[in-house]
Amino acid sequence: MEPSILAVRLKRLLENMIRTSSQDSGRQGVLARYLEERLRERLPPHLWPHLEQEVSVPGLAREKKWDLGLVYPAGSSLPKKPRLLISLKSILKNPSGSWPNRLDDLVGEVSSVQLLFPEVVVGYVVVLDYGAPTKRRGGVYRPPQGNELDPIYARFKQGLAALAQRRPPLWAQGLVEGC
């Protein structure tokens, strides 16, 4: 598919996602389907059946449902192993209070699964709403003024960059592959 068509489609999808209530647990489903389609275009056909949404994978602490996962082999005599796992996150409300929690989520989710499956590749897709309402004193939410969220999102991106450096020789748990 033409890159410009993909960009327009992704933009519309994200705009709709941002307009959806931050309390709607299914709001990221459209993004998961989009990513699944993009991955299928790049995977060999014999792996397509193993790419699923909402895939349950054991972790050291507990089982987690990953938004998108490539888990194979799927034969009855062979144990399933996650090869690629993708977690979708969004910050659509109160970014100043949410971004540290998203980084903590990342480290916890990734460490738990990497301790059991150290070779797994983990992706972390985050949607940031630069117009997200921010909690003010007294618990009142209001839209940001100008570029006031820029420093908050810059710190979040720095935190993600610090965690996105999993490559030889740095294979530590809690890190993800960078792009």
Give the ranges of each region predicted by the language model.
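Conserved catalytic cores of phosphodiester-cleaving nucleases, focusing on short active-site segments
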Residues: 68-70, 82-92, 106
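Short coil-to-beta-strand
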Residues: 5-6, 77-85
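Acidic-basic catalytic patches of nuclease active cores, encompassing PD-(D/E)XK
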Residues: 2-55
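Phosphate/oxyanion-binding active-site loops and adjacent basic polyanion-contact surfaces
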Residues: 24-32, 61-64, 98, 102
